[in-house]
């Protein structure tokens, strides 16, 4: 049996709406899928108010051993060393463990794991092309340092992770070039049964949506980097043939200090329907009601959780060319990101059922081989490869001879 300790945020059982990012939900699904295939998984997670220090959920042991902040990752690494598992898998986003103050802790945390005889694997949920870091990038991502400083810091961080980990995982094909030697494992999918057309219409009506219009959906945290303004401007141009739904709350990192989401509602409240945060039991209905998911990301630096959800639910996707390169989407799923061009594409889908069917077919084809079970199998193969590569030569020889 493979024994793995993950360092990552993990959903609390009582406050799921307060997740700091999609990484917590990702960790839960991956851990459960690994456990279902016989892997012993322990998660070292941040403390969450009202949650026990230690719990066991669906076969996964969760220990809440550290607080977010400057000491988050070094403290987590110490707990992971004590766990006994040979592999420690860190799920990493730049500000995930407590904002900018937590970033310097990456190096000592990974070094501590290496000196303790552990095999650190790191999944980079965000990968930035240093050449993309300019004034516009820092403004969009609310990074409060000059572009030169941000560029050096982000590129240095990515090199550091590569050097101190035994293997690095990324979610998108285009990120493999930016992190040489990395392993691409796409986001896993929860694959749902197709929703019959009449059932989808009934769901539309129950949500107060028009059945005689194309329902376009933008889903997930409202963040400046997603190009939501472009979708809103396109909907304004497209007119009555398109009904745009913006489903998602303010990003937790921005909610308390940035008016971005409120500004969108104020500027475009008469163009689209803003429904706010969608509780987990209601997510499937919104994807079933949507005729198309819009992902006009201008410069993606991470794979898209809503993209994976759409593939799982069978909801057709229109995405930017840059996101298509990242996730390996075919040309059929690419749409212009300029508002007039996107509006034209939406009107085409609204007026031509054959084009919408072709988009649905392309989306369904891309979903094959991307279930959480597939993602777990790819991780298990990676863990086995890492363990074998770092096993003493004499033991490797004996194992192969005995096989």
Features from the language model and the residues they span:
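Short hydrophobic beta-strand element within catalytic cores of glycosyltransferases
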Residues: 292, 311-320
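Nucleotide-activated donor-binding/catalytic signature segment of Leloir-type glycosyltransferases, i.e.
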Residues: 257-284
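Donor nucleotide-sugar binding/catalytic pocket of nucleotide-sugar-dependent glycosyltransferases
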Residues: 147-199
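Conserved donor-binding/catalytic core segment of Leloir-type glycosyltransferases
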Residues: 209-226, 232-236, 245
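A short, well-ordered alpha-helix in the C-terminal region of glycosyltransferases
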Residues: 355-369, 381
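A short helix/loop element that forms part of the nucleotide-sugar donor recognition site in Leloir-type
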Residues: 195-209, 262
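Membrane-proximal helix-turn-helix segments that form the acceptor-binding/catalytic region
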Residues: 107-115, 119, 143-167, 264
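Conserved acidic donor-binding segment of nucleotide-sugar-dependent glycosyltransferases
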Residues: 331-340, 347-354
């Amino acid at each position: 049996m493979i024994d793995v300790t993950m360092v990552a945020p993990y959903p609390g059982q009582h406050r799921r709406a307060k997740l700091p990012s999609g990484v917590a939900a990702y960790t839960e699904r991956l851990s459960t899928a690994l456990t279902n295939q016989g892997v012993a998984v322990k998660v070292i997670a941040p403390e969450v108010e009202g949650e026990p220090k230690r719990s066991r959920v669906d076969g996964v042991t969760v220990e809440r051993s550290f607080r977010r902040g400057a000491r988050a990752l070094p403290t987590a690494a110490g707990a992971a060393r004590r766990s006994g598992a040979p592999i420690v898998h860190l799920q990493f986003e730049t500000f995930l463990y407590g904002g900018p103050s937590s970033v310097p802790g990456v190096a000592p945390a990974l070094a501590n794991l290496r000196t303790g005889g552990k095999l650190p694997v790191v999944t980079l949920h965000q990968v930035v092309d240093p050449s993309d870091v300019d004034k516009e990038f820092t403004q969009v991502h609310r990074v409060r340092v000059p572009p030169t400083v941000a560029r050096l810091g982000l590129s240095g961080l990515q090199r550091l992770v590569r050097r101190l980990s035994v293997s690095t995982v990324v979610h998108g094909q285009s990120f493999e070039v930016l992190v040489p030697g990395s392993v691409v494992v796409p986001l896993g999918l929860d694959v749902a049964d197709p929703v019959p057309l009449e059932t989808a219409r009934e769901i539309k009506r129950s949500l107060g949506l028009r059945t005689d219009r194309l329902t376009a959906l933008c889903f997930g945290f409202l963040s400046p980097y997603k190009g939501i303004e472009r979708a809103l401007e396109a909907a304004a141009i497209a007119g009555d043939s398109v009904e745009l739904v913006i489903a998602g709350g303010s990003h937790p990192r921005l909610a308390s200090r940035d008016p971005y989401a409120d500004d969108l509602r104020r500027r475009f409240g008469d163009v689209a329907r803003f429904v706010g945060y969608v509780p987990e039991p209601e997510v499937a209905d919104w994807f079933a009601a949507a005729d198309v998911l819009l992902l006009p990301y201008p410069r993606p630096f991470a794979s898209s959780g809503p993209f994976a959800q759409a593939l799982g639910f069978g909801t057709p996707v229109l995405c930017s060319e840059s996101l298509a390169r990242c996730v390996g989407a075919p040309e059929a799923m690419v749409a212009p990101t300029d508002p007039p061009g996107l509006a034209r594409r939406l009107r085409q889908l609204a007026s031509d059922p054959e084009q919408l069917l072709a988009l649905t077919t392309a989306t369904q084809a891309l979903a094959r081989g991307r279930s959480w079970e597939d993602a777990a199998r790819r991780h298990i193969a990676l863990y086995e490869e890492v363990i074998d590569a770092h096993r003493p030569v004499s033991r490797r020889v004996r194992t192969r001879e005995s096989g």
